Amino acid sequence: FKDDQAEDYKKALATLNAVLVNLYKSGKQPQLNILTDRLQLKEMHNCGAGDSNITLAPNGKFYLCPAFYYDEKMGISNRLKHHKLSSERCVGDLEAGLQIPNPQLLKLDHAPLCRICDAYHCNRCIWLNQKLTWDNNTPSHQQCVLAHLERNAARDLQQQLKAAGFSAGEEIKQIDYLDPFDVREQF
């Protein structure tokens, strides 16, 4: 995803919103996770990889998520050449148990940008984080922009549904940024 694609994605989300509103008006209550989930969420909702979920792979090893296993299995763990190639992406095995170094660093409360963000439907993908920022707990610009485009589209949907007489959850406030890093305060 590149910044110049943001407008196209925004238009696609607006088109989906129009379809959703028309379906609501016809008596249906469709769900489209990237737009409707945010209407009901009150906190961050992602996969919880490495924190509340762990992957046990066919090789008997534990991984923070399946993507790390497939990185190792396919030998692509260093595609972006950020650091020395390592085929060991596991965080333990059935014999030795789970051994996540610094597990607190995978938690939301240790992610300065994410813990104050309200793009609750963000993927916050630790595999992508590691690939693009070298840090499991810091999302890339691309992830933040996508999440905020979807968040803002969910806000637009919420306003359209309310205008049509439907209940649409707690108000999603208007913001004027797509990447929280651009408006961050010192941590």
Language-model features, listed with the residues they occupy:
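Short catalytic-site patches enriched in acidic/histidine residues
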Residues: R38-N46
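Radical SAM enzyme core and accessory elements
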Residues: K73, K107-F187
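C-terminal accessory region of radical SAM enzymes
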Residues: D8-L39, A67-R124, L132
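Conserved acidic functional residues
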Residues: N53, P66
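Short, small/polar residue-rich loop motifs at catalytic or cofactor-binding pockets
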Residues: C47-D51
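Short, acidic, Ser/Thr-enriched surface-loop or helix-capping motifs
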Residues: L56-A57
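Radical SAM/AdoMet-radical enzyme domain recognition
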Residues: F1-D3
